[in-house]
Amino acid sequence: MLGLRTCLDPRDAACQTVPMFEHKPRPEWIATEEFISNAVVHPDAAVEQAIRTAAEAGMPAIEVAPNAGKLLKLLVQLSGARRILEIGTLAGYSTIWMGRGLPHNGKLVTCEYLPQHAEVAWANIDAAGLGERVEIRLGPALDTLAALAEEDREPFDFIFIDADKQNNSRYLDWAVRLGRPGAVVVLDNTIWEGAVLDPGLDPVNAPGIIDALKLLGDHPKLDATVIQTVGSKGWDGFALARIT
């Protein structure tokens, strides 16, 4: 998915003025994605409500595509995750998909900076029947992550990062600190319409994405790969990593 996510650390001056970055989906990509969604993914009323309420609230349509949401759910289930950390809530679309993959005693903590986004997200999460499994932590994500490190909590089994790109590397560092060995880390928006090859296409967001990719390759406690994607959200991708 392309476009700016909620700025989760307002202390970063770049976050204050980040423009939306236009994604450029081709008609055949959109048609194929719709076919996959109808044939395999089968998004239900709860996730569709999250998209609808986000639009009604004037929020940007930058949630992951349905097939990516289903992938997150499957990754949660395949990894046997019981505790999920999400950085970037928006309207709760990804939150619902991942929450659906948790066992009944599972927990998901999601970080959101904007109160109005958190309000919409909570209504969607509760309507999906996940209110008892999900906790929204309001405020700058870096502050929330530092607070989580001070709390007496079990480490996380699954971390999904989909927030402001300038802080990607810092979010990855926190993922390693807060995740257990063997935990899965997913970082969204890793191709950014090719801006990783030409940072001039988006000089605000591209450097943070590139730095995060380099960190994924160099970090001694991360084993990672990157998958390119095309669809309604344009040409993009995600990184999939394991904490060693």
Regions found by a protein language model. Give the residues of each.
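Intrinsic disorder
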Residues: 7-8
